[in-house]
From Swiss-Prot:
Entry keyword annotation includes Nuclease: no
Family listed: Belongs to the DMRL synthase family.
Gene encoding the protein: ribH
Role this protein plays: Catalyzes the formation of 6,7-dimethyl-8-ribityllumazine by condensation of 5-amino-6-(D-ribitylamino)uracil with 3,4-dihydroxy-2-butanone 4-phosphate. This is the penultimate step in the biosynthesis of riboflavin.
PANTHER family xref list: 6,7-DIMETHYL-8-RIBITYLLUMAZINE SYNTHASE, 6,7-DIMETHYL-8-RIBITYLLUMAZINE SYNTHASE DMRL SYNTHASE LUMAZINE SYNTHASE
Reactions catalysed: (2S)-2-hydroxy-3-oxobutyl phosphate + 5-amino-6-(D-ribitylamino)uracil = 6,7-dimethyl-8-(1-D-ribityl)lumazine + phosphate + 2 H2O + H(+)
Classification of source organism: Bacteria, Pseudomonadati, Pseudomonadota, Gammaproteobacteria, Enterobacterales
SUPFAM superfamilies: Lumazine synthase (SSF52121)
Transferase found in the keyword field: yes
Listed name of the protein: 6,7-dimethyl-8-ribityllumazine synthase
CDD domains: Lumazine_synthase-I
Residues that coordinate or bind 5-amino-6-(D-ribitylamino)uracil: F22, A57, Y58, E59, T81, V82, I83, F114
Gene Ontology molecular function, alphabetical: 6,7-dimethyl-8-ribityllumazine synthase activity
A GO CC term attached to the entry: riboflavin synthase complex
């Protein structure tokens, strides 16, 4: 039986991080976790990490698509935070962001990791950005690296 398993170490990987500025008091922690995970656990050199800031989560899919199309990166990590409010705005932004990022990932051969928090409250977002529930930015970064290795192993 042939089993393919990914590892997270990818020292030669070139990784782009697209991050939303809206809710940056939370997203800054996601970014810190992602960069730390890439460098410390994934062994990615800092010069191989590019960070691109965009206004909000809705702008992430187009930005990630553009990054993927440059063919400069082995993986892209999308980071942001969408917090439910009193209107339907949450559903539109969260849904389009998720759908758009998924479409980019499926249309390309480059892993796109989803590190966008979609929470019911600010407290939930803070918990997922490095306190009680870990750091989802770090998790997304490690997912991106593991997928780089899995895809490379599948392609042989």
């Amino acid at each position: 039986m042939n089993v393919i398993k990914g590892v997270v170490a990818a020292p030669q990987a070139r990784v782009a991080i697209a991050i939303a500025r809206f809710n940056n008091f939370i997203n800054d922690s996601l970014l810190g976790g992602a960069v730390d995970a890439l460098e410390r656990i994934g062994q990615v050199a800092s010069e191989n990490i590019t960070v691109v800031w965009v206004p909000g989560a809705y702008e992430l899919p187009l930005t990630v698509k553009t990054l993927v199309e440059t063919q400069k990166y082995d993986a892209v990590v999308a980071l942001g935070t969408v917090i439910r409010g009193g209107t339907a705005h949450f559903e539109y932004v969260a849904g389009e962001c998720s759908s758009g990022l998924s479409s980019v990932a499926m249309a390309s051969e480059i892993p796109v990791a989803f590190g966008v928090l979609t929470t019911e409250s600010i407290e939930q977002a803070i918990e997922r950005a490095g306190t009680k529930a870990g750091n989802k930015g770090a998790e997304a970064a490690l997912t991106a690296l593991e997928m780089v290795n899995v895809i490379n192993a599948i392609k042989g």
